[in-house]
């Protein structure tokens, strides 16, 4: 149990370090642009990070649960056929 707690502490420390690095990069990009464009740069970077996180989550979800997703798709197709052709 102690090994898991130590590993979680390491993950938290790494996440904090990664967040500081990303903030440093964003801060550097913001100061290279005119003041008028800074909010747009922040918005673009936030949207880009959001899309990356969604992509990683989707790839992980599909790769770990593809059997269940295929069964769900088959069920939806079957129910759609039943709804349109039988009812």
Swiss-Prot record:
The chain crosses the membrane at residues 39-59, 67-87. The keyword Glycoprotein does not apply. Interacts with OPG158. One of its GO terms (cellular component) is membrane. It holds the Pfam family Chordopox_L2. Keywords: Early protein, Host cytoplasm, Host endoplasmic reticulum, Host membrane, Membrane, Transmembrane, Transmembrane helix, Virion. It is a multi-pass membrane protein. It comes from Vaccinia virus (strain Copenhagen) (VACV). Induction: Expressed in the early phase of the viral replicative cycle. It is found in: Virion membrane; Host cytoplasm; Host endoplasmic reticulum membrane. Belongs to the orthopoxvirus OPG096 family. The keyword Manganese does not apply. The lineage of its organism: Viruses, Varidnaviria, Bamfordvirae, Nucleocytoviricota, Pokkesviricetes. Early protein involved in virion morphogenesis. Participates in the formation and elongation of crescent-shaped membrane precursors of immature virions in cytoplasmic factories. This is Protein OPG096. Its main location: virion.
